[in-house]
Amino acid sequence: ASEPTALGLPRIFPGLM
């Protein structure tokens, strides 16, 4: 779960997207 999101942040927050 350390894949970069569209925001460039680590996917440590499932509710980030």
UniProtKB/Swiss-Prot annotation:
Q: What is the name of this protein?
A: Tachykinin-like peptide-II
> Secreted among the record's keywords?
yes
Q: What are the entry keywords?
A: Amidation, Secreted
- Tissues expressed in: Expressed by the venom gland.
Main localization of the protein described in the UniProt heading: secreted
Q: Which residues carry this modification: Methionine amide?
A: M17
Determine the domain of life of the protein's source: Eukaryota
Cellular compartments annotated: Secreted
Q: GO cellular component terms?
A: extracellular region
